[in-house]
Amino acid sequence: NVCQSRSISLRLELCEENPVVSIDTSLFEQVIINIIKNSAESIGENGEIIIRTSASPLMLEIGDTGQGISKEVEAKLFSPFFSTKPNGQGIGLIFIREVLMKHDCTFSLRPYPDGITRFRICF
């Protein structure tokens, strides 16, 4: 587990409602794994990943206390083959974008003033 090996804590803030969403669960599982992996890599060591859900609006949000995202990087995040990682291929966020668009989700990835970078998915 990438989080355990880096001393990263996971905090769950899940809504009490249990909404039903029609999605390809295997694709969404991979989306969530990719987002959490990116968060862990951004944090490095000793940080926190927060997974939050809400029912109204129906939303999944994954936030992290990592290094954040500059405005320059934010503008390029979903560009093919763009990566901030030394050996990154720049296809992870492209895959995520394609899955979310296929499911008619809206999404954003940006830093917030509280120091947490959030990937927000609205269904």
Predicted regions: what they are:
Residues 1-123:
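Core catalytic ATP-binding domain of two-component histidine kinases
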